[in-house]
Amino acid sequence: KWIDSKSIRWVEFQQNGVIRLLKNRKDWIKEWYTFMHDPQLDSSVHQLKTVQWKTDKFQPEYFKQLSSDPEIQRGGETHALAVLQDFIQHRSKQYMYLISKPLESRSSCSRLSAHIAWGNISIRTVYQSAYQAKTNGNKKNLNAFLSRLRWHCHFIQKFEQEVEMEYLPQNKAYTSYVRERNTDYIHQWEKGNTGIPLVDACMRCVCTTGYLNFRMRALLVSFLTHALL
């Protein structure tokens, strides 16, 4: 309403196969595949014009004081593309076999989740690279990986259309169910001190390294929502 009142034109570009203002998901999968196979756009960075902005906040001396944490995965598009190619050519060969193993999956999974979340690389770029690589073999593992890229967009699409799930149970039978929350238990969960070894190991791992594979992330969230909330 505020944008309309100020006569501001809002331009929003579709990304990662999620469709805004979709009435239902009946044909969503078909639309998703169409979007994933569409040509990638040329960014034409050389045509961009820089903004001249004088400030003393970004001095070279300041950046020299910054240091990277060796435990944390590096960011940026260049590193994201390198991680993608390493996964497709090498690590994906053990993808399905090791996907449920908390430790081994740290290398056999794509390690692209953080890059996708931060916008270092698009799902369409990842999809097309993995799809083309299937012709070189390893089809079963790469197909499984491609299906999980669709899952990523599916869950965001679901939240796009059912925003109330952030506050209300998906199963309406639980709407009137009231359970007290123990905030101390939740704080202990946040620190990895629940006393349950696998849950605590997963939480401490993600706090230290910034990464946890899909199934271990699901474990942490499931424990929180089913046992503590």
What is each PLM-predicted segment?
Residues 1-146, 156:
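Active-site "lid/cap" and pocket-lining segments within catalytic core domains
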Residues 108-229:
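Active-site-proximal binding-pocket segments
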